[in-house]
Amino acid sequence: MEYRKYTKKLALLCMLFLPLTTMAQKQYYLPTASASDDEKDKPMIEVYLPQHPNGCAVVLCPGGAMRWLSWESDVVKMASFLNEHGIAAIGLRYHLNKAPMPQGMKMPPMVDVTHPEAFPQADANPMHTASGDSIIFLAALDAKAAIRMVREHADEWKISKDKIGFLGFSAGGGVAIAATMSADSMERPDFLCTNFGPSLMPVNVPQDAPPLLIMTRADHPNVAAGLVALFMEWKKAGANAELHIYGDGKGPYELMPQTGETTTETWSSQMIQWLKAKAMIE
């Protein structure tokens, strides 16, 4: 009897770790890497391919205030979730700000969701500096290079060239938005999702703007107002946009257990439904 219990526990553990061991992973340095970059800081992509691909690919831009990357929550866990839905996941390591924090820096004013006009052109960057703005520019180059590389490998990775888009978290959302605004045809995403990540620069919506999905929480200072402003910029330009503002005030926006106690935990399933509605997946 004890042996049977032990084998059952062992089988359960194997099942728990199976998705991690079967997930394909490849790494590629991006052409935006320079000789001056430290090895650990060079921009690159990590590729997670599903066992049963449906042709869609998502470039994951993790958050981290442009100073670190929330890799485990925003890439590794998210890639596993996307792979379960047949979607290829591409984790992006982009350039980060290595400059010391300015001395005596004050907290920015807290802007409520009801005042999106506080962010003209949806620029919700709390503090523009020369070094900070240059890093956003470099990170956007990394993101565009990632989309280009996915398209170049599309046949090999069983990806449709017209079903490649961004999902950005926090600062990674700002990177994805910046990349989208300046992309050429090979770099342009087919869809853009930002998860509590407003624009970090003035928004100029491109003529061929992809459909935009925005997810945020009503009581998130500055972020919610900045994302409402982003939605308005997209709509004023005649582009397709959808905005989800969750009001229950719970949860970070990583993958969350489906407890039924909060609406924020449904963001990932709602994103999958949105991708279906946009004909990116079946």
Where are these regions (language model features)?
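C-terminal catalytic histidine-bearing segment of alpha/beta-hydrolase fold enzymes
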Residues: 43-46, 105, 114, 240-282
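The feature captures the conserved acid-bearing segment of alpha/beta-hydrolase catalytic domains
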Residues: 190-247
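Short amphipathic alpha-helix adjacent to the substrate-entry channel of hydrolases
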Residues: 72-90, 232
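Short beta-strand element of the alpha/beta-hydrolase
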Residues: 55-64
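Primarily recognizes the serine-hydrolase "nucleophile elbow" in alpha/beta-hydrolase
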Residues: 137-209
